[in-house]
Structures are given as structure tokens and as C-alpha cells.
Amino acid sequence: EKIKEIFSKFQNKRLNNNLWKIDNVNKKVSNVFNSDQFISYSSYSSWIRKDKNIDAVINQYKDYEDNISIIKDSNFKNSKNYPNYFSYPNPLSEFPKGTIAGTCLHKIIERFEFRNDNNQELIDLIIEELNFHQIDTSLAFKVKDAILRIINISLGRELQNKKLVDIPNEYLIKELKYDLTLSYEGRNINSNDISNCFFLDQEYEFGEEYANKINDLQIMNKGFHSGCIDCVFPVGNKLEDSKWWVIDWKSNLISGSDNSDCLPRNYNYENMRNEMIKHHYPLQSHLYLLALHRLLKWRLKNYQPHKHLGGYIYLFLKGLPDFELFEKSKSEDISPGIFISKAPLKRINYLDNLF
């Protein structure tokens, strides 16, 4: 309880627009407890910063990054030609880069009710958050247009072509916090334990190739692993038969070699997949699915993973095209800026036994 109290104190402080790092919290906790009493908290962000190629700003539960990647080309999967409107900049092209900007976007999406069609209320909310994060409020209408893309873009056939605006507010669970215990037969969980999961379900995304990358993280932890899922929601004709999905908002900037920023054509499958691997999002997504799996097992009567556990969606906010033009195109492809994968159940079962 004392540890929770300390974490809560730091979690609630939003002073000078700075995000508290977990190191600050651990130092405070260590002053209260001696080493043999201390139970540590880790997070996805604290794990990935052990990769020398990653510089993550973290707090107890959330990571707020605004990563920048430069690509060589913008060819779509299977070398398909992209329509002209995929070269129209996303409304967030003028939005600031950096951690504070990423935090601001997350807070706006968190607070906004997707089915609220009152544009003035949305503008007021956006201006409030822009002011709080000390960002130019003249960008409010651009941010509003970006939010409308987020909630109105089709999520593809795997999700019955649903849009976020189609999901009733009462079924949208935002900012779902979780804690996973880290104990495997009384010893620390390490990178090798976790990497073994990605040798399973090789027909799914991020298999052996990614498994070998996890060992770079040098994970060695006991205690608790804490995280927060941006959004969880069901898709199906009946709630009891619905599949549940996790969705994570990413404000990463994928820039073309010609300095083209925030163009949907830059956010194709291959580029998003590379971005996922680079920042260890596969690890994050599998931890999210494990947390969702345990929640559904606890809360759903007659829960069956193959029936109810849907998968994960990574939505790159700066890569979404105009939703009206995309809908008119009647494209059967997934929109740029959306990366989707069904739940790899063997991997989730492995992690469920490990954690």
C-alpha cells in the first residue's frame, strides 16, 4: 500500500508539463524500504530503454514517444500504386514533435467521446489541452480534423469494417491499467524467457526475426510489470460473441527521404512493420493481449480465447488519409497508418504461464 501511495503521488503530478520518470519513483520507494523489502515495478518503456538504440521517456504506466524515422521509399506492399490523396499531408503535419506533443494528443483522444458529434465541444477540449501543454492553439482545427480521421477510418475486414465511431461509448474502455506479476518458479524473468514466445505461432507477425531482437533488452526482473492500454473494445453482432481488441495510438513520424512528412503513403505495411520492430511494439502488443486475456477470463462467462480474444491494432495518428476519400475508393486494403494482427494464441498462453 505504501508503494502504491508513492506511485500515485508521482502519477498525479503534472507540473511544468514534465513526465515523471520511473527512476524518480524507485528512488523515493528505496528511501522507505530496505533492499530485502523492496518490490520493484517495471514497464515496457523501462525494458526497451535498455536497448541502446532507444531513448524513451516514461512514467509508471504510459510511454509517450514521438519517434522519427526516415525511409528510403514509399512503395506499398506488393508494389501497388497508391492513389494521389495518399500524398496529401495529414492534418498533424504542422503539429509539434516531441514527448509533450505526443502526450497532448493522447490526452485529447482519451477525453473525447467518439460518438459526440458536437464539434464545438471537441474544439473546446482540444484548446484546453493545447493550452495546458503550451502548444499553439491555432492548431486546434487541424487537430480536430485529425481526430475525425481517427474515429471515422475503416478498421478493415478483420473488424467487420467497423469504425471507432461505430462502437458504443459504454463498450469503449480507455486507459486500462494493469499489473502483471513477474515470477517464474521463484526466479527473475529474463529476456530469453520472453523471446521464446516469439518462436511460437510463426504464421503470425513478428516471429523468429523479432525473438532474436528481444535478447538485446537484457531484461531481468521480479516484482510487477505495469502498463496501460490506450483503448479496448469489442467487435461483433452480439456482445457475448464479440471479439475484443486492443488499440494503441502512436504519434511516430515516418518521413520520406525527400523530407516528406505525415504523408499516408509513408505509412505503408512495410514501413509500419519496420517501425514496430525498431521500437519493440511487438513486445508491448503481446503484453497488452496477455492483460486483456486475463481480464476477459475473469469477467466473461464461458470465455474462450479463440472466440473472444481478437488481436491488436496500432494506429499511427500522423499517417491516416482523408477518411471520406478512402471510403469513396472502396478499397479492400487496410488504410495506411493502421497495423493490425490477430491474437497469436500459443504465444499468449505461453506468456500466461510465464508471468
Task: State the predicted function of each range.
Residues 1-355:
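Structural signature of nuclease core domains in nucleic-acid processing machines
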